[in-house]
């Protein structure tokens, strides 16, 4: 009997492999980067679900936490109010939302599911706006409901919850970030 010390590494996410093999050389050619470290890449994806109604009913935050953990496969962080605002009936420390920060392979897997499964399931989807960059190559967009993710069972949804998704890149300009995301498969509207 022979013992092998080989450990099977988990498979590389499909989008990460495409980025390494196709997108890096294409971006180097497009922008004329001399060093491979200059090529923009993805740093993290932040998925945020604000639940303003949780100020009146604290149980609503549990639904948001359950939805976010099902969608991202990671336990969300509860966002709490920084200070009390009487007009909104809000007290300091009250839970008002939940967010998840995805990095590494989980980030690539989530992005793949978002682009190939979730966005095409949106009714009357015409593409994402190409103007929502922040000036530093990061892109933020909002989704109006969580049902487009196949991890969520539409029959068990207690209420619609929207979410903000921020894709943080190492791109220095919006043009570089737009080119990176377009090559990754983001369906931007043609203006």
Swiss-Prot record:
<dbReference type="InterPro" id="IPR020930">
    <property type="entry name" value="Ribosomal_uL5_bac-type"/>
</dbReference>
<dbReference type="GO" id="GO:1990904">
    <property type="term" value="C:ribonucleoprotein complex"/>
</dbReference>
<dbReference type="InterPro" id="IPR022803">
    <property type="entry name" value="Ribosomal_uL5_dom_sf"/>
</dbReference>
<dbReference type="GO" id="GO:0006412">
    <property type="term" value="P:translation"/>
</dbReference>
<dbReference type="InterPro" id="IPR031310">
    <property type="entry name" value="Ribosomal_uL5_N"/>
</dbReference>
<dbReference type="GO" id="GO:0019843">
    <property type="term" value="F:rRNA binding"/>
</dbReference>
<keyword id="KW-0820">tRNA-binding</keyword>
<dbReference type="GO" id="GO:0000049">
    <property type="term" value="F:tRNA binding"/>
</dbReference>
<keyword id="KW-0689">Ribosomal protein</keyword>
<comment type="function">
    <text>This is one of the proteins that bind and probably mediate the attachment of the 5S RNA into the large ribosomal subunit, where it forms part of the central protuberance. In the 70S ribosome it contacts protein S13 of the 30S subunit (bridge B1b), connecting the 2 subunits; this bridge is implicated in subunit movement. Contacts the P site tRNA; the 5S rRNA and some of its associated proteins might help stabilize positioning of ribosome-bound tRNAs.</text>
</comment>
<dbReference type="Pfam" id="PF00673">
    <property type="entry name" value="Ribosomal_L5_C"/>
</dbReference>
<keyword id="KW-0687">Ribonucleoprotein</keyword>
<keyword id="KW-0694">RNA-binding</keyword>
<dbReference type="InterPro" id="IPR031309">
    <property type="entry name" value="Ribosomal_uL5_C"/>
</dbReference>
<protein>
    <recommendedName>
        <fullName>Large ribosomal subunit protein uL5</fullName>
    </recommendedName>
</protein>
<comment type="similarity">
    <text>Belongs to the universal ribosomal protein uL5 family.</text>
</comment>
<keyword id="KW-0699">rRNA-binding</keyword>
<dbReference type="Pfam" id="PF00281">
    <property type="entry name" value="Ribosomal_L5"/>
</dbReference>
<dbReference type="GO" id="GO:0003735">
    <property type="term" value="F:structural constituent of ribosome"/>
</dbReference>
<comment type="subunit">
    <text>Part of the 50S ribosomal subunit; part of the 5S rRNA/L5/L18/L25 subcomplex. Contacts the 5S rRNA and the P site tRNA. Forms a bridge to the 30S subunit in the 70S ribosome.</text>
</comment>
<dbReference type="GO" id="GO:0005840">
    <property type="term" value="C:ribosome"/>
</dbReference>
<dbReference type="InterPro" id="IPR002132">
    <property type="entry name" value="Ribosomal_uL5"/>
</dbReference>
